[in-house]
Amino acid sequence: MTTSQVLHPRWADTLMYVYEKSPNENNQNKSQIMEGLSGNCPATHCRELISHPALGRHSGTIATHQGSVYSDISSPETGRQCPAPQTSSSASLSYGYPFGNPYYGCRLSHSHNVNLQQKPCSYHPAEKYAETSSALPTEELSSRAKEFAFYPSLASSYQAVPGYLDMSVVPSISVHPEPRHDALIPMEGYQHWALSNGWDGQVYCSKEQTQSSHLWKSPFPDVVPLQPEVSSYRRGRKKRVPYTKIQLKELEKEYAASKFITKDKRRRISATTNLSERQVTIWFQNRRVKEKKFVSKSKTNNHMHT
């Protein structure tokens, strides 16, 4: 038997329950099936179809579209409507799904004789994820039925389990952005690899997007591209300043007296030649290395001649 239930006309969206009953079930369970709409769903195949808000104004076409998929069988309780909550129409829930197919089917297990109030492992009650806002008081939230929109999870904090579709069940009551609660909805025939390139995939974008000035060519031959300015504060090798003849004569005189310089001698030479003590020390070091190379080269030449 297929039963279509449409909510109160003042609700902006349409909630349709389709029940598929096995042939061995009798008609006495019809009343229990209808009670499943208020929260106690019997052990039958239950599919919840939630429409897109943009399709709310075409509620008449939804039933026509579903008629091509599910054949409606007339029954005495077909026209029974869900009890409308005692709330104003301005406090109606709104939800949106901007991606792809606006319907998601949820199938409950037929072999387990449990209702939704017993909280099976794959069931998450609506009260757990209800978020309150300033627009609706707490009494109205508890009195009316909760509606949820299913969104693909953009970021999940748990490992994806094969056989379960990674979805997010979020109430659309709150308008401010809040972290969505993730839920596992069992889906039949679901392949985990089919969504490997879905929302969880990361797109790499290089941050280094530099443009070389020498590669730029102007369409006009007279235009010369601007070259990048060389920084005047670039730290490089200091320009070498040659010593004067008077300074070199004084240094050679002290070196002839002693190849190694003392602290007092370095201060005296620095004051006489107007050089820093560091310059005097470096000059003596270079002078010793130069003499060592000269001696080594002289020995090599003498050895070759002999």
UniProtKB/Swiss-Prot annotation:
GO terms for cellular component: nucleus. The keyword Membrane does not apply. Residues 236-295 bind DNA. One of its GO terms (molecular function) is RNA polymerase II cis-regulatory region sequence-specific DNA binding. GO terms for biological process: fin regeneration; regulation of transcription by RNA polymerase II. InterPro entries: AP_axis_regulatory_Homeobox, HD, Homeobox_CS, Homeodomain-like_sf, HoxA13_N. The keyword Hydrolase does not apply. Sequence-specific transcription factor which is part of a developmental regulatory system that provides cells with specific positional identities on the anterior-posterior axis. Belongs to the Abd-B homeobox family. This is Homeobox protein Hox-C13a. It comes from Danio rerio. The gene is hoxc13a.
